[in-house]
Amino acid sequence: MAVVRRAVAARGLQMIAKPLTVVPGFDVWPGLLDISAQRALVEAVLAGAEQAPFSNYRTAYGKPMSVAMTALGSLGWTSDARGYRYVDRHPETGRPWPDMPPALLDLWTVLGDPETPPDSCLVNLYRDGARMGLHQDRDEADPRFPVLSISLGDTAVFRIGGVNRKDPTRSLRLASGDVCRLLGPARLAFHGVDRILPGSSSLVPGGGRINLTLRRARTA
């Protein structure tokens, strides 16, 4: 995982200094992670999934999600008839979540919050046909902490709006190696993934997109 740290140190600082601000509080660093760093992260995620398998959770209304999910870190997000929440063990295996790779902690220190580490990394696996409807990330205890998102694999058509569901939205493509951040006025903005572009990357075995989102779920 040192390759990710080198990517940040050697070629990330210039990009970090000049993000693309899509809307106030939503910044994108296109191509921040080089291909070696991307491969290292995919390898770490898939190794973690052997301990905490991907699952297609159901919404609180009983509908299965098209996106398969797991997590890294001390907490993972889950959904069922009881609602949406963070838990300290995989809901199916009962085992603790795998550790978060140090490289992700390094990225958070630079782009997230240098004083308070993340306690959860949600791992979303999008295969062909999967999507994520517009939603807010509001299950965390303190929204002052950002959400840091890393795209790996196939390009996603990402959509972001405002803090109200009916606010106008705009879409952009997030490619493998792109990193983005929701912070401040955009922290509770509605956002989602309309679709992925199958075959736009060969990074993820079997095709698809892996999205990593670093969060601070509980109060510091």
Curated annotation (Swiss-Prot):
Q: Which residues bind Fe cation?
A: 135, 137, 191
Listed A to Z, the keywords are: Dioxygenase, DNA damage, DNA repair, Iron, Metal-binding, Oxidoreductase
**Matching SUPFAM superfamilies:** Clavaminate synthase-like (SSF51197)
* Superkingdom per UniProt: Bacteria
Q: Which residues form the Fe2OG dioxygenase domain?
A: 117-218
Task: Tell me which family the UniProt entry assigns to this protein.
Answer: Belongs to the alkB family.
Q: What is this protein called?
A: Alpha-ketoglutarate-dependent dioxygenase AlkB homolog
Q: What is the protein's species of origin?
A: Caulobacter vibrioides (strain NA1000 / CB15N)
